[in-house]
Design a protein with these regions (language model features):
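Reverse-transcribing Pol proteins
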Residues: 189-191
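Active-site and adjacent substrate-binding regions of carbohydrate-active enzymes
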Residues: 76, 194-195
Length: 196
């Protein structure tokens, strides 16, 4: 609305394909841009200067600061410029494994940039104008669908089994202790996610 530039491609790098037929998109970024989203990711919430792999899989040896990648990978993020307070959303409509480089790589020949690279499919990008993060989330969920509110009985605690197999010993006892604790603390709707 105010004439601010929300997005620019990098000339000569914008859309390309490498020798392994992976398709890439390069976007201009600024030093004071912040990047939020990407689905389930560990580490700092602002992913500026981070490299992220997007592939569902078990994260054995999980580290809350650095583990990548986790199960829920969503090729959507919001770029927020700290100076202008302008935000824009990027949704890459592709379910293939991919990765994002959010300015970690710097070159002398081009303006600062981020890259999206997909192992299969096309670069099918939806740019979602702000100006606010709230506006972008509203428009993104208009596009992808909104979650319905679950009944109260379904809003209990859901535990993950990722922690228990990595215990040095007595992992079965730890699971049973967790269940006992939830009963003692009157935590309803206990569920657990795991793999055999």
């Amino acid at each position: 609305k105010d004439g601010s530039l929300l997005h620019a491609d990098i000339p000569d790098l914008a859309y390309r394909e490498d020798s392994n037929h992976r398709r890439m998109h390069a976007s201009q970024i600024e030093a004071d841009d912040c990047f939020y989203g990407f689905g389930e990711k560990s580490g700092e919430i602002n992913k500026a200067e981070k490299y992220m792999n997007m592939a569902p899989g078990d994260a054995m040896g999980y580290n809350a600061k650095e583990t990548d990648s986790l199960y829920k990978h969503i090729p959507f993020y919001i770029k927020l410029n700290r100076g202008t307070k302008q935000a824009v959303g990027y949704f890459y409509h592709n379910t293939a494994e991919c990765d994002f480089n959010m300015g970690r790589e710097k070159r002398n020949y081009w303006h600062r940039y981020s890259t999206y690279r997909t192992d299969a499919g096309d670069v099918d990008l939806f740019l979602i104008a702000g100006p606010s993060i709230r506006d972008i989330i509203e428009r993104y969920t208009d596009l992808t669908g909104k979650s319905v509110m679950l009944p109260k009985a379904a809003l209990g605690y859901l535990g993950s089994s990722m922690y228990y197999p990595e215990l040095p010993e007595n992992s079965d006892d730890a699971v049973l202790e967790f269940i006992d604790t939830t009963h003692e603390e009157d935590i309803p709707g206990i569920g657990a996610v795991g793999r055999n």
